[in-house]
Amino acid sequence: MKTNNQLKNENAITLIALVITIVVLLILAGVTIASLTGNNGILTRASDAKIETAVGAVKEALKLEQGEKRIEGEQLTPETLLAEGKVQRTVQQEEDGNYYMYYALKNNAIEGMQGLGKGNIVELKDVFLIDDNLNVKYISNNGKEYGDTINNKILEDETKIRFASKAFSDYVSKISGVTEEEMKFKWMKNQTSLTITDSSVDSLQDLVFFPNLTSLQLGTNSSDAPQIISMDGVENCTKLENLKIYYGPDKDYSTVEKLDNLETFYRYAGTDYNNIIDGLKECKNLKSFSVISQNITDMSRIAELANLESLDLRLNQIEKIEGLENMTNLTDLKFDFNRIEKIENLESLLKLKAIYLTSNNISDITPLSANISLTTLDLRGNSQIDGERSNYTGQRLVALDKIERKYKKEFYNKF
């Protein structure tokens, strides 16, 4: 007996075959590819019709929900939809220098979206936007717009801001010295750095009102770390360059991949190393990566962060150096307090200037002779290293001499 998944797959294959057959028949009938796929082509018009139908269905669903709210003596607005978890916000600075706030429907939040609206709210692609009058506009991945003209909501310096999270609102009120009722966009707009040290904060959605942040820190110790399990909201901080996270629960970092300007990432404690790699592997400008005290045993996924210059994996359980063979931009490595027994897979790192290997299980340092740019080497706490020159012969002695000559002043090996 066939499973539902098998039937779905067969139906999908049948549909694809049908579409291909129709296209072939149309071509044989003299219909050109341009007339199929051009701006006014059959397929383009079919796609437009689907989108216009979806826009109409969403508008109708909102009207029905609005009617239900009125019966209950309430109103339906983007803010009430936000409170219900059906809408997300983004703040964009446009070419005129003004900041505009947009409300976008979340995926499948309203009946009739037909699989649309799964896109990037920060880039305003594949999104349904609504305004205070419940006008609906859909923006496709190619930037084409469908539906209503929506009223842009300008955020001026004196615009009062209402946060979605009460805990976040309380914290901002405390650090700004402004009551929640008097919070205005100007203060948030002017912040380039924000540190959140309140364990009651459990959401970053309100970072939408901090469009100019370049540095964000969550927590300083285990008692003040925000209880955030998802980094959703941080994608609105498109200028963010530095992100530091101390303690707190393991997190979903999927939205971090949208931070094109992120250069430095630091995480202390937790066990979310793989989640971090999943989220940061698309951050092509990431230069410095630190994940400390996470009991990491396998570091091979570091290879997915190809452009790193500095790597810090102190206080873990790493036994083997791996994944660095093609990371030729690395200049700084910190592996203190791990279980590394062998210096290996570093030969290609010709730009490497510093390596810290305090308190590991290393016995042979001669492989470091290949790293011609190395000027700083810390091997303290590796008691297995043989300090007797007479025990070195052949190529190992040549390598040792090379290291000693290079580090006449800088090299120290207190073991």
Features from the language model and the residues they span:
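N-terminal single-pass transmembrane signal-anchor helix
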Residues: N11-S35
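Membrane-proximal N-terminal amphipathic helix
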Residues: G41-Q75
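Periplasmic/extracellular, small/polar-rich flexible segments of pilin-like filament-forming proteins
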Residues: G67-E156
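N-terminal capping/linker segments that flank leucine-rich repeat
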Residues: V136, N141-D224, D232-T271, I276-S290, ...
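Asparagine/serine/threonine-enriched low-complexity, disordered tracts
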Residues: N212, K239, N261, N285, ...
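Ankyrin-repeat and related helical/solenoid repeat scaffolds used for protein-protein interactions
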Residues: K334-S383
